[in-house]
Amino acid sequence: SSDGLHFVAAPSILGPSYFRVFLYAGWHYALVMPGSVHRSVDGIADFITGPTLFEPAMRHSAVRVVGDWLEVYWTRVGGNRGRIYRSMVDLCSDWMDWSVSDPTEILRPERDWEGAAEPLAPSLRGAANELVNQLRDPCILEDDGRTFLFYASGGESGIGLAELFG
């Protein structure tokens, strides 16, 4: 896009859906749902599939490189899991040997607009067309030395924003 408003799709298909790209050590990597890693020299073509780091229940993710670590903010399907988790990946080893840390819960519905008053129910793949007790779709924004996490609240009923520290 020349103006950030109008886009023309390139003919090549980069990879599966929910393709979260990050740069590290001269390579373009992508974390895709449900948790496999792909890489490419130029980030435009020839992404090859590498290891699967996450469980099949991984839904959406957001990624951020901090030094030699990849921070992954992610959600799950199934169970009563409408929460956002954070896991870390040490990027120092060969990418085919990467592994993910155990998840740490960082956010769950706390307010009515986030679905906190709704009953706990299994999170399903696909759209949530009514208010549910779930957070989804994390997205990271770094601006002026601050880091923010956007997320869909109440399933897909609103958008929340939290500042990340540390």
Name every feature range the model reports, one short phrase each:
Residues S1-G166:
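Carbohydrate-active catalytic/glycan-binding domains of CAZyme proteins
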